[in-house]
């Protein structure tokens, strides 16, 4: 897929990474949240510029930053102002003065458009992510139960969680049963990225909402995808999510853990045809600005220019 611009190499580990880099005499090495490769690069005999890209928002996965040596990296790149703060918080004293460069995530905006199809059915509250405490599937279930009481026809969909252990998967269904939403609950454990636009479009056309209950996000790609496909979002106000765009009817933020507030926000979008129509109009009005800010065809050259400037190539 990447040819002729890139070659993929599999099986690189801490033992063979340094010889591979030395043999190919790379000008620039980019390491994304991988302490194993950082350690490997300590034995390089060549002298490429090394950039560490920081994308994870999970605090325990950021702890490697506190073990960095001054020679481990020349620069940092990350995706949000929030993550700049987390890097500064975790970085060891040895790299406290290293420059941190901001380059927001980009996507192919042509993959995320409202698909004008007939999607008959009840409203859907969509939830996307891994089945874990960080994404907080339990909060989604609790909010869904509250919504169901006021809007009994609404369906509740999870997309993701393919790697969920069987025991945890059983717990998900048992929770749906206990909360009285099992008949409205749907779980699609894997949807290919190029099909997600259709999911967002279905939710939008049925007057639904994308609900986010996450405890932390370094950027919020699923939120951006949803907005580009004209699907409104109700989200916990965590991490970098507030940086994506200004809040409005189509992008509402609630304090993490506020089940009642998030329930009311969702119901406000689900129960009013007039409010839904107004929200769709507002979403259409910001699409061009989102594309200009995040579209890969517009922004990717800026990332390349940044690498060239940092690598001194």
Where do the model's predicted regions map?
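A charged, aromatic-enriched C-terminal amphipathic alpha-helix characteristic of glycosyltransferases
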Residues: 271-308
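A short, active-site helix/loop in glycosyltransferases that binds the activated sugar's phosphate group
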Residues: 61-67, 71-99, 107-109
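Conserved donor-binding/catalytic core segment of Leloir-type glycosyltransferases
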Residues: 77, 111, 116-135, 141-148, ...
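Short His-centered aromatic/hydrophobic patch
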Residues: 31-36, 54
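Nucleotide-activated donor-binding/catalytic signature segment of Leloir-type glycosyltransferases, i.e.
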Residues: 169-197, 202
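Aromatic "clamp/platform" in nucleotide-sugar-dependent glycosyltransferases that forms part
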Residues: 215
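Conserved acidic donor-binding segment of nucleotide-sugar-dependent glycosyltransferases
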Residues: 247, 251-260, 267-277
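Short hydrophobic beta-strand element within catalytic cores of glycosyltransferases
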Residues: 209-211, 232-235
